[in-house]
Amino acid sequence: MSFGIICYKVENGEIRYVMIQRKDSLAFMEFVRGKYNQTDINYIKQLVDYMTENEKEMLLENTFDAIWNYTWCQSSQNIFKHTKEYIESKTKFDYVINNMCFVNVIKSSKVKCNYLEQEWGFPKGRKKVRENDIDCAIREFCEETQLYKDDIQIAKEINPFQEIFFGTNNILYKHVYYIAKIVKEKSKIFLDNNCLEQVREVRDIKWLTYAEVLSHIKYHNIERIEIFKKAHTIITDSLLL
């Protein structure tokens, strides 16, 4: 379960929302971390179909270590390469990348690639030990936007929205979003290359209008589209009075 914030501000009479673009697609991350059965070519094909063209090229043209370093933004000598996850993920990668069936899956998928960029969404993340829901949402929001806690005000009178769906791995996911507004006019969102928590997860960040938000959410994220529409209606009808 993840907790996040749908944050808005009013600029020149128009509501705008903070959206972040993931650094990597969920499918790419799942593949790099070895979250698959290495003999299940159908599921691997499904993962590949949800990757961007650049991610597919990366798998074909780079060693596992290079991909791992890129994914976690770490040096080639990082000690985490001795972890169980690294060893198991590398073993699976080496197995499938040397299988011509897998290589052909990527090449055929590249021809019909529908995903030109990583997905956009609202800042969110998972709780730390003994962290409550709203504190998690605020911390993740601040890490991913570089805003401060006192830059925003949570609308505590509005019940949080729940995005519940089954992922491509058939696992049920639940994202909980609070509504918040910007209370400091000079607050700025930006990418900080020195903030590891942000650069590992975020590729881009923008303020977007209602129409732009809808155009940035991928068509298969039906639940995200619906909760955003509901949130926008409540903000328009109740919070701007």
Annotate each PLM feature.
Residues 3-7:
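Short beta-strand scaffold segments in enzyme catalytic cores
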Residues 12-13, 24-27, 183-187:
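Short, charged/polar surface micro-motifs in flexible loops or helix N-caps
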Residues 2, 14-16, 117, 202:
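A structure-centric signal for secondary-structure junctions around beta-strands
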Residues 1, 11, 170-172:
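A short catalytic or substrate-binding loop motif that flags glycine-/basic-rich loops and adjacent residues
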Residues 16-139, 143, 147:
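Conserved Nudix-box catalytic region and its N-terminal flanking loop in Nudix hydrolases
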Residues 148-159:
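A short coil-to-beta-strand element that immediately follows conserved catalytic motifs
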Residues 30, 65-68, 72-73, 110-124, ...:
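Nudix hydrolase/Nudix homology domain
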Residues 1-2, 157:
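Eukaryotic beta-rich interaction modules
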